[in-house]
Amino acid sequence: FSVQERINIIKSDITSLNELNSKINVTELSGLLTTFAKDQNATCIIRGLRAVSDFEYEFQMTGMNYQLNPDIETIFLMTSEKNSFISSNFVKEVHKLGGDVSNFVSKNTLEQLNKKNS
C-alpha cells in the first residue's frame, strides 16, 4: 500500500476510538522522528517489540534519538507471545498465496488487501 492508502486504512480502523474523544492523529512522517515528536509537543515515543531481534535495532535507534533530543523518552511495548511472529511482510505474502489472514488484520484491511490483490 502507498503511504496515503495506509493512512486511510488506519483512519478508518480507528474511527470508533475517535468517537470516544481520543486524540489520535494519523499523519505521514517525513524527516526525523525526534523533530516530528518535538513539533507535536510529544514527550515520548512508543515503539513495539515482537522479538529479541527487534530490540537491537530499536536500542540503537533509541540511542540516536536521545542524542538528537534528550527530552524525548522512548517506551517499548512487547507484543503478546501469540502475535510475536506476525509481520506485515508475512501477512502480505500469505495473502498473496491465498492464505487466510483474517486473524491478523482488521476487516477493513482485509477488504483493502483483497481489492489490491484481485
Where are these regions (language model features)?
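Nucleotidyltransferase catalytic core that binds NTPs
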Residues: 1-118
